[in-house]
């Protein structure tokens, strides 16, 4: 199963900005690795939450569309809420 998500570049940093994103149904994330600089991004929570239920989400290469540019990544780390079925933050590593 191929996964493809649309992402926006994240400009506001910090705890307050991250909380506002989560309250609006979005997840803060970061893409790093390779020769390019790390990029902070915003993803839709519901799309990611549904996709992460599939086992292949953790092993396959995922395509992120960031500002019209496709980036191939793999999930490096994922933080979940302690008792709610929600994602808090996700790290992607360029494939």
Curated annotation (Swiss-Prot):
Keyword flag Transcription: no
Key words, A-Z: Ribonucleoprotein, Ribosomal protein, RNA-binding, rRNA-binding
GO biological process, one term: translation
Top-level taxon: Bacteria
GO cellular component, one term: cytosolic large ribosomal subunit
Gene3D superfamilies: Ribosomal Protein L25, Chain P
Pfam family, one: Ribosomal_L25p
GO molecular function, one term: 5S rRNA binding
Described function: This is one of the proteins that binds to the 5S RNA in the ribosome where it forms part of the central protuberance.
Oligomeric form and interacting partners: Part of the 50S ribosomal subunit; part of the 5S rRNA/L5/L18/L25 subcomplex. Contacts the 5S rRNA. Binds to the 5S rRNA independently of L5 and L18.
Sequence similarity: Belongs to the bacterial ribosomal protein bL25 family.
Record protein name field: Large ribosomal subunit protein bL25
Biological classification of the source: Bacteria, Pseudomonadati, Pseudomonadota, Gammaproteobacteria, Pasteurellales
Record gene name: rplY
């Amino acid at each position: 199963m191929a996964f493809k998500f649309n992402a926006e570049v994240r400009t506001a940093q910090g705890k307050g900005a991250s909380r506002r994103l989560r309250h609006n149904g979005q997840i803060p994330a970061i893409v790093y690795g390779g020769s390019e600089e790390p990029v902070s991004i915003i993803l839709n929570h519901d799309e990611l939450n549904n996709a992460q239920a599939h086992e292949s989400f953790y092993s396959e290469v995922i395509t992120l569309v960031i500002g019209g540019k496709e980036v191939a990544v793999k999930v490096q780390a994922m933080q979940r809420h302690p008792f709610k079925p929600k994602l808090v933050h996700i790290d992607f590593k360029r494939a």
